[in-house]
Amino acid sequence: CDWSSDVCSSDLGARIANACAALHLSLKELTVDCGIDILSFGGTKNGLMMGECVIIFNKDLQREARFVRKQSAQLASKMRYLSCQFTAYLTDDLWLKNAAHANAMAAKLYQALKELPEVTFTQKPESNQLFLTMPRPTIDRMLESYFFYFWNEANHEIRLVTSFDTTEEDVNQFI
């Protein structure tokens, strides 16, 4: 990270696909056009079994990056098995379709939850994550059946995240 911040502008893109889908922008518009030199293009949170793809947009940094990758232990012995997932992931914009679906499921969940008087959204819903508060007893009941994180336990703020495989039935059942 020190090398990255000293030499270039980088972005850790675990949810960059969701941002592209939500903003209706291309990956280029959210990276290269904004001055990003290196992107960790996330796949695990958007449908891949595992793996992130490091994309180096700045040609001057590409040669040195091969060595930095090894020094920071980011070279899996069977990299080709991890990498081959990206062929399908990038074909026909599957990465973008998965993200758009996750965002749509979050929007559906938001529309239902905003009608509940005990729910207050703490951040404007923009992608596949919802941040909200509700009474602690309600949260405790929900935790018996669903897994989610406290974002700020002091004020009962939780984070709900939808994904590429969240179905409308999942959302309806949660509601």
Walk through the language-model features, giving the residues of each.
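Active-site C-terminal subdomain of aminotransferase-like
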Residues: 21-22, 26-129
